[in-house]
């Protein structure tokens, strides 16, 4: 059997949705994000009727159900709605509040996608789209993923 082309990265993120792009932007160099879609952030693009309900400023840990009630408290204390709103404002995306603290883009959800992609580009995140995943395995100290990109099978291994 022929050896597959290998690619090694520090961090591999599966999925270029909101969470994947935010995680990548905060992880820094050596990050690869892969997604099967033709474009990153497809669910963001259609959310909120195309205007993206990007946060709720009244979001509190009590709004979350979990077996570990401290998880939401910990997560929101590290990065809350106002932190994301600061990011939106830094990118000069105009927004408005609808009901009960729900914030939407004035123009288009595509602005949020562009913002997240700009944040990833700023820290040299690599993005592979139209890449399908066929298997994931843990091997020693790294994770390896078998993917198909542009009709070619490859193996990507990552420390995280």
Labelled PLM ranges:
Residues 145-149:
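Short beta-strand segments that buttress and anchor functional surface loops
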Residues 49-99:
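Glycine-rich active-site loop/strand segments that organize a redox cofactor
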Residues 12, 28-49:
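Glycine-rich FAD pyrophosphate-binding loop
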